[in-house]
Amino acid sequence: MGRIDTLLGDITQVKADAIVIHDLPTQDPVHEITIIPRGMAGGMTISLPQEDRAYQSRQELEERIAVCLGGRVAEQLVLGDVSTGASSDIQKASAIARAMVTKYGMSEKLGTIAYGNESDEVFIGRTMAQARSYSEEVAGLIDEEVKTIVDRAYARCEEILSQCRKELELTAQYLLVHETMSGAEFSKVFTDPESEEFLALPSAT
């Protein structure tokens, strides 16, 4: 993969996160979008909390999963292929969904029950089955519920990004030129897309 392909992949994933965040009511607003590499990340979307939260609702968690899946969905929609770039976000999405089912009692099928406990970890000499405190049948149901939650979030993310292709393109054009976009500039993608700063941009394609 060449540098241009890598750059387009980074832009696709970063801008997608921002677009999804913008469309979801429980998520903190976008403060900054950048494609400048930071650590292992090729770029990032930064959100600033509007208030301190001690707890998170089911809606907040489901919408957070949708945000995590933004990069993967955008790769498929925009580039027509997927890469390993979204792997950490997919792991986060899966972990949130599993916690909803096994820790937070947010599964309709499995009910308000915590499955396993903090000591249910696999140590040397112990298999996963030995460490687990519930049956194979329950384990299968947990996997099904996790998949249902992730699939539902994926579908919602796909719907948002499909409806916001123009905003995706405009954000990409801006990032290709400037590399970093403030929250105020990003908001104008939705409120004032015909402003001079956007009309002067070259096409990203």
Language-model-derived ranges and their functions:
Residues M1-D23:
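Macrodomain-like recognition of ADP-ribose-binding/processing modules
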Residues L24-T205:
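Soluble catalytic regions of large protease machineries
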